[in-house]
């Protein structure tokens, strides 16, 4: 099957995995705003516009100017040195000291999380200081069946969040994607060097066992996903195709899934696989949702879903009947797979409240709740039973249209720091404290088995991993070591380990490590005392059920 690789692979100085979405209304800027925002090299901006076909060169200016512009084009497309994701290091995202929890307090998700973490019915003081009391009750046999319940285990594990760097792997170019498999046995990393690396994570290991050269890649691999049975993986790029490849076996068999787009320059920014592995969902730069049926081996749907790039797609739960999409129009839409039609592309509802484009969506897995990351520097928590009104959708669209800065190469304007809720915002909660610059930064719910999904965690343009408490909105952990933006983050489904993938070319595994040993913890015998101190284990009191 032939491939048509997009020549626009380098489009975008920060992350070309998006189309240029600066609207005419956003071109007008006041003198005060121009002084506040960081200056941008006009020659580099012009080079970007030329590459996107939005500006043409006419006669005049001399050959020297043409050569200069071409040199910029070559440096950005081939060497990718113009924007390396380090701009965000100078940006200190404002933290919301008093998150508004009024909507969340009245919603069932509060009860769900408290039940899943053993906090339901406990007073606030008991929730914070109940660890020794829990151990004492277990020793007295007062726990259910003599051991901690799943909720109590999750509450204990919250005391052992990853806090230390356990493993690092370095690449020659930017790391774009990194996710654990559903069972936690494999970690997959995708890099701008067009290589997909697989790591064996069984029995506490993190060892690379396979490297696969991706095919038909323009600029970089943009998204990856595992098949439900864990035997294959999929990846997308600036290409007409989504590719699927085997994980096990001696050879690498790449199968191209042709989406047959109408656009000449085409990219799939986000992919998801149905629970039965039959359908592959993709969101693309032409504003469309694509559905590819693997059994029929053809594209079955092309839905005009958003007014701009579709940056994020996700299935709501294991049924794969409800799905979510988010785009640069700042709207998150909810679709029913059973009623999706190309001739009548109507979602069942929409969620509005963001003021700029959505970069990622993660479902809680219960077909009710989801979170979205946005260029407005916030994460929002949604309940799909609370769709937005027309007023809310119009307010969100208007706010996105009036944005007059580009998050790929500019600093966040000070006016975007304001804590402002749009009319008709139907979100349950808004989380502030991380930066979203340069690229489509991801955020996710923490695992249900080990944490009861009591946390939300996100990458950050300042090179951090930021962990929020879902119910309070406060930041409970920041993991700092990267020198450029962290684009992707993934929490092990059963262990207290987080892997961050950064544009500094590094993959970092974070785990819990005890800060110091106390005298009571040390052995008393002389024979044991002469031995070296044991290395703290990375696992928490509850091991993986693998």
Swiss-Prot record:
Pfam families: WD40 (PF00400). WD repeats lie at residues 170-210, 216-258, 263-302, 305-345, 353-392, 435-480, 481-520. GO terms for cellular component: Cul4-RING E3 ubiquitin ligase complex; nucleoplasm. Residues 1-19 have a biased composition (Low complexity). The keyword Nucleotidyltransferase does not apply. Pathway: Protein modification; protein ubiquitination. The modification Phosphoserine is found at residue 75. Keywords: Phosphoprotein, Repeat, Ubl conjugation pathway, WD repeat. Residues 1-40, 523-546 are annotated as: Disordered. Residues 537-546 have a biased composition (Polar residues). GO terms for biological process: exploration behavior; gene expression; memory; proteasome-mediated ubiquitin-dependent protein catabolic process; protein stabilization; protein ubiquitination; respiratory system process; response to oxidative stress. It comes from the Eukaryota. PANTHER family: DDB1- AND CUL4-ASSOCIATED FACTOR 11. Interacts with DDB1 and CUL4A. May function as a substrate receptor for CUL4-DDB1 E3 ubiquitin-protein ligase complex. This is DDB1- and CUL4-associated factor 11. It comes from Pongo abelii (Sumatran orangutan).
